[in-house]
Every structure is written in C-alpha cells, then in structure tokens.
Amino acid sequence: MAQQRRGGRRRRKVDFIAANHIEYIDYKDTDLLRRFISERGKILPRRVTGTSAKNQRRLTIAIKRARIMGLLPFVAED
C-alpha cells in the first residue's frame, strides 16, 4: 500500500541576528557564535539557522577568527 504524504507548510526561519538588531558580529562573543555551531564544532548552514546570506558570511568570518584565537574549538572533544 502506498503511504500518504502529510502536507503542511513549514514555518519560515527568522534571522536571529537581524531580529535582535545586532549590528556587529564580534568574534569574542562566543555565546552568540555557539548558537551557529553544531555539537561537532561545524558551522551550521543557512537552511538550518535561517540567517541571511550577508549575516551568514559575517558569522563565518567571526567563527573562523574565534577558532584561530583559541576561543572556539575546531572540532568537538569526544
């Protein structure tokens, strides 16, 4: 028997940075940056977080800077 698909509209993700009026994404703000990193330490994509392209680029740069400075890990510790 064929299964029926359950339809439904998914809720549009909101850009957290734009919604909270964050002008500058600081690499030293690790609490903010950790929201956009997976448990394994990877940067989460836009389709998961809902950030705009501009803010995703800024986040990526800030996360990479924080990793180099030693504020964030490159990979998660098991």
Curated annotation (Swiss-Prot):
Query: What is the native source organism of this protein?
Result: Limosilactobacillus fermentum (strain NBRC 3956 / LMG 18251) (Lactobacillus fermentum)
Which keywords does UniProt give here?
A: Ribonucleoprotein, Ribosomal protein, RNA-binding, rRNA-binding
Q: What domain of life?
A: Bacteria
Record NCBIfam families? S18
**How does the record describe its quaternary structure?**
Part of the 30S ribosomal subunit. Forms a tight heterodimer with protein bS6.
Q: Which family does it belong to?
A: Belongs to the bacterial ribosomal protein bS18 family.
The protein in question is named Small ribosomal subunit protein bS18
Regions annotated as coiled coil: none
Annotated function: Binds as a heterodimer with protein bS6 to the central domain of the 16S rRNA, where it helps stabilize the platform of the 30S subunit.
Q: Quote a single Gene Ontology cellular component term.
A: cytosolic small ribosomal subunit
What lineage, starting at the top, does this entry show?
Bacteria, Bacillati, Bacillota, Bacilli, Lactobacillales
Q: Which Gene3D superfamilies match?
A: Ribosomal protein S18
According to its UniProt entry, one GO biological process term is: translation
Q: What molecular functions are annotated in GO for this chain?
A: small ribosomal subunit rRNA binding; structural constituent of ribosome
Q: Does the keyword Repressor apply?
A: no
* Pfam families membership: Ribosomal_S18 (PF01084)
